[in-house]
Amino acid sequence: MKNLWIWSLPLIVLAFIGWQELANQMPVATSRMTYGRLLEYMQMGWVKRIDVYDRTALIEASSPETGWQWIRVDLPANSSDWLEQAKTLHIDVDVHAVSNWINVASNWIIPLIIIGVVIWLLSRSASSNTTGALNFGKSKARFQMVAKTGIMFDDVAGIEEAKEELAEVVAFLKNPSKFLAVGASIPKGVLLVGPPGTGKTLLAKAIAGEASVPFFSISGSEFVEMFVGVGASRVRDLFKKAKQNAPCLVFIDEIDAVGRQRGAGIGGGNDEREQTLNQLLTEMDGFEGNTGVIVIAATNRVDVLDAALLRPGRFDRQIMVSMPDVKSRIAILKVHANQKKLHPQVSLEAVARRTAGFAGADLANLLNEAAILAVRRGLKQITWKEIDDAIDRVIAGMEGTPIMDGKIKRLIAYHETGHALTATLLPNHPPVQKVTLIPRRQAKGLTWFMQDNERDLLSKSQLMSMIMVALGGRAAEEAVFGNAEVTTGASNDLQQVTNLARQMVTRFGMSSLGPLCLETGNEEIFLGRDMRLMPEVSEEVIAQIDAQVRGMIEACYEKVLELMQANRVVMDRIVEELMEKETLDGKEFRQLVSQAARLTAVN
């Protein structure tokens, strides 16, 4: 800005002087007039005086219409008629010589201003580029001498095993002599692995809050740029700063952005990302070592990381941050419910059992959505109704416009009743939690099931029940409306059924083909894996797999169709109730089923 004033000040002074000079020499005209009109004014005797400045004339005239005024007239080149007429009419004519300095200044002021602005912009751009070039290879890591994340281990719930592992790292940083006395060495790195939303980044913040040592944080994507060598330079700069502040912590979030496996994927070769990874490997455990620097990284794609990055000496510990079970969900809900005003009748245990498959971030979002609904409804406390609606919203999306067409609504009611009734009549399927005709996202209706416990291992009978329940909607449509009226509403169900049946045959060995793993290669070659198109499976075996999958699905469908036809009365009664209320909870649904005179179940 200072240079701009230096360049602009002489030009402003020059322009002001020229303007003053012109203002002193030339009177100010109040209007303009054509040359022909000037001759008319002279014939009428209204012109008193003419001042000529080069090719411009200022006329002192007085007419009955406008009175006395100065009028500007542009004189044609080589015109002398006005001069002859002025002599004849004895009009005063005064010719003024315009200063050459004024002409020169007026011609050069604008070009000089433009040149000055261009020079200033170029100098500013050059300065900026020089600074940017010098800092381009510098690390973008955020540095805190004493981390102030506001999060401690007490604020992290539901992942106690991971907290215990990381508490040892914090204890080592606070009191290394205790460990060194027995010959224990400080771990080089800790890799936090787990699905999205399970609290990996939150754990890193808690470590920073507990350790009271210098803390660097950076995302893996911030290392890689389009320019060659920048990523490796940033890695060197990061570890240089870290070593200067040792002992310290370095947190790399989403390390898979820079740590993907090197190999024979498409494109392969020595690209910029591989150079960055090579530098990271060297800094973590190379010739010089990184004494006093502990690297904590987080990823949800440990399967794509390079093997050299995962070996002991770089990441000594891999801590699995898994999805929370019921007990962990209760602990997480208690942490997030501290700042929420819950109704006394709201049971966090009931919420935890209702939210199987929810990660910690999902549970936090759930309570926040419930709080927003409570405010929207004018309540001062969060009731079970708000939590129930929030769960539905998180799982299935916002409520859509209610279906007004009675025929379509009845068809959807039979479809959802088919799912729920099949699940109720099968002995080894989770009970119905809710059946609704309220549209959400792409679904016109929904059926939820209650997960009583976390099922990590599934039996063949349980998988068969899942297939039959998924086919229940289509079977109900056919049982009531006939095969010709079966709709596209079961497309997603059929996709799930086909995938599950194929896994039972090719992955779980639950078919007449025997206990064999016949999966095709699913390696993602773009992740640096080897290109493998198919395993060593013959075309005959592939045909047998297709036949097994088809036979399994057809057998299940026949059983479910028989079940729907045998329980048509029960189904009609449930549909009528569902059409009236639009939503039935699990208790209401089971009560309607229990009132039936005869139930036919399938073994």
From Swiss-Prot:
GO BP term (any one): proteolysis
Q: A Pfam family name for this chain?
A: FtsH_ext
One cellular-component annotation, GO: chloroplast thylakoid membrane
Write down the required cofactor(s). Zn(2+)
Q: Which UniProt keywords apply?
A: ATP-binding, Chloroplast, Hydrolase, Membrane, Metal-binding, Metalloprotease, Nucleotide-binding, Plastid, Protease, Thylakoid, Transmembrane, Transmembrane helix, Zinc
Cofactor descriptive note: Binds 1 zinc ion per subunit.
| Residue spans, topological domain Stromal | 1-2, 123-603
The record's top EC class is hydrolase
The active-site annotation reads E416
The molecular function terms of the Gene Ontology recorded here are: ATP binding; ATP hydrolysis activity; ATP-dependent peptidase activity; metalloendopeptidase activity; zinc ion binding
Q: What membrane topology term does the record carry? A: Multi-pass membrane protein
UniProt binding sites for Zn(2+): H415, H419, D493
* InterPro entries hit by this protein: AAA+_ATPase, AAA_lid_3, ATPase_AAA_core, ATPase_AAA_CS, FtsH, P-loop_NTPase, Pept_M41_FtsH_extracell, Peptidase_M41
Q: Which cysteines are joined by disulfide bonds?
A: none
Q: EC number(s) on record?
A: 3.4.24.-
Per UniProt, ATP binds at G194, P195, P196, G197, T198, G199, K200, T201
Q: Which residues lie on this side of the membrane: Lumenal?
A: 24-101
Q: Where in the cell is it found?
A: Plastid, Chloroplast thylakoid membrane
What does the UniProt function comment say about this protein? Acts as a processive, ATP-dependent zinc metallopeptidase.
Q: Self-association or partners: how does it assemble?
A: Homohexamer.
Its family remark reads:
In the central section; belongs to the AAA ATPase family.
PANTHER family membership: ATP-DEPENDENT ZINC METALLOPROTEASE FTSH 2, CHLOROPLASTIC, METALLOPROTEASE M41 FTSH
Would you tell me the protein name for this molecule?
A: ATP-dependent zinc metalloprotease FtsH
Species of origin: Cyanidioschyzon merolae (strain NIES-3377 / 10D) (Unicellular red alga)
